[in-house]
Amino acid sequence: MYLLIPAAGIGKRMGSNRNKLLLKVRSQPIIAWTLLAAEAANTISWIGIISQPTDWPDFRAILADLKLTKPVELIQGGSTRQESVYNGLQALPLAAEQVLIHDGARCLATPDLFNSCAQAIRHCPGLIAGVPVKDTIKVVDEQGIIQETPDRQKLWAAQTPQGFDVKLLKQCHAEGVRQGWEVTDDAALFEKCGIEVRIVEGEETNLKVTTPQDLAIAEFILTTRGV
């Protein structure tokens, strides 16, 4: 299975002006934990890191330190996540029929989750990892007045990995460019094109490290794992 990791974000909410994936959690950069999980997943055979060239020296140093056995390619990112994934799709080896896309900041995803998604995508056009929502969700207007309370039984919090048929995802990205769609994940492109996307049970610990509080939680979870 081929894995693309969007990794071009700046850690503004971390109070940092550099790529947040270079920040350390328990002595390793955030991106290193993501890469180690992908390395340990027996279904993953190739990894593409989509990032800005200014970060490549740092990423190369991390890769040299990790000594991964799987091929890793650095791919130039775009100005948005959507553009970055599009660039990543163009850089996939020709043999790639399915692809997993995983946020580099979700550094707590386990090898088992990568394997589950890699196996499931062979039987459907698209999927995302996700977990059922526990909190009651409110829809509010611009004035902060509650308009609606959706049925919690139908709500899932989207995570990554997300998996797709490569040919279909390329078509959806091309349609997104033509239509001027702006989306926050690739599943939304499939939805707009009317293509089925399934849910694979994710992991409660698979949080996206975005704030200093997330960083502290990630430290705690990694400590409990004994790594």
Swiss-Prot record:
Belongs to the IspD/TarI cytidylyltransferase family. IspD subfamily. It is an enzyme of class 2 (transferase). Its EC number is 2.7.7.60. Pathway: Isoprenoid biosynthesis; isopentenyl diphosphate biosynthesis via DXP pathway; isopentenyl diphosphate from 1-deoxy-D-xylulose 5-phosphate: step 2/6. It comes from the Bacteria. The keyword GTP-binding does not apply. The record marks R13, K20 as: Transition state stabilizer. Keywords: Isoprene biosynthesis, Nucleotidyltransferase, Transferase. One of its GO terms (biological process) is isopentenyl diphosphate biosynthetic process, methylerythritol 4-phosphate pathway. One of its GO terms (molecular function) is 2-C-methyl-D-erythritol 4-phosphate cytidylyltransferase activity. Catalyzes the formation of 4-diphosphocytidyl-2-C-methyl-D-erythritol from CTP and 2-C-methyl-D-erythritol 4-phosphate (MEP). It comes from Nostoc punctiforme (strain ATCC 29133 / PCC 73102). It catalyses: 2-C-methyl-D-erythritol 4-phosphate + CTP + H(+) = 4-CDP-2-C-methyl-D-erythritol + diphosphate. This is 2-C-methyl-D-erythritol 4-phosphate cytidylyltransferase. The record marks R152, K208 as: Positions MEP for the nucleophilic attack. CDD domains: CDP-ME_synthetase (cd02516).
